[in-house]
Amino acid sequence: MQCTGAKILMECLVEQGVDTIFGYPGGTILNVYDELYNYEGDGRIKHILTAHEQGACHAADGYARSTGRVGVCFATSGPGCTNLVTGIATAYMDSSPIVCITCNVGTSLLGKDSFQEVDITGITMPITKCNYLVRSVDELADVVREAFAIARSGRPGPVLIDIPKNVTAEKADYEPLPRSAHGTSGRLGKLMKRSSQNFKAPEPDHRDIDKLVEMIAASKKPLLICGGGVVRARAHHEFEALANRIDSPVAITVMGAGGFRGRNPLTTGMIGMHGSQASNMAVDACDLLIAV
């Protein structure tokens, strides 16, 4: 069916399971907000208006950390998109899956120093896993789907999609994403295989596990480091059981905060520049360091 770029964007967000968007409107993104109004009206997507675009990006980051799902934020061109930079950098450093959607001036105005034209894809290249400038409405759906697959897969992180205003108004055929990758070929098939419905976390090699067990058994002063992976995997109980089983002290990273009970006598506190002396000395003294 024929849809505007704005509607294609919203349909793709719905099919990716997005239920909350954080953002702040502006001139170039108005077509998207006009379409968002319909989706918020029927309860499919909730929009949270922030006081500043940086707040929207940080909120999307917080949403991703607390739910384990991809956070989404909207921003307009110029100062709107540049205000996202700190939030994007934070998500990149902390491996938080977010998709930032910005709108730019029309394609005919790109590269002409137009009002509020900013090369946001160039600015964010070092702090995103991938970013896109969508020049044709025909490629919009595939770009959105690929962005979510990239944000989720491997080491999670931020992805940015910049859409010129005219692309949000132009029309193209929209093909809903199939529920299964069966019978789907080409780029869409590859995207389906990388989607959240079909993505499987990597499984450990049992030979490596056996080797680790041998190393632990031979160690006299092992040290466990509780990192962000414990929190993201919600493996708090399993990690604590491991620490208790091998009777190893536990140092905690900033991202691992909350992954190990502070009242457990095995904890040495936070590690690093702002960490405890006990944790940092334990790193120097251990004969086996296990970072999780």
Language model features with spans:
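N-terminal alpha/beta PP-like core and its mobile active-site loop of ThDP/TPP-dependent enzymes
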Residues: 1-292
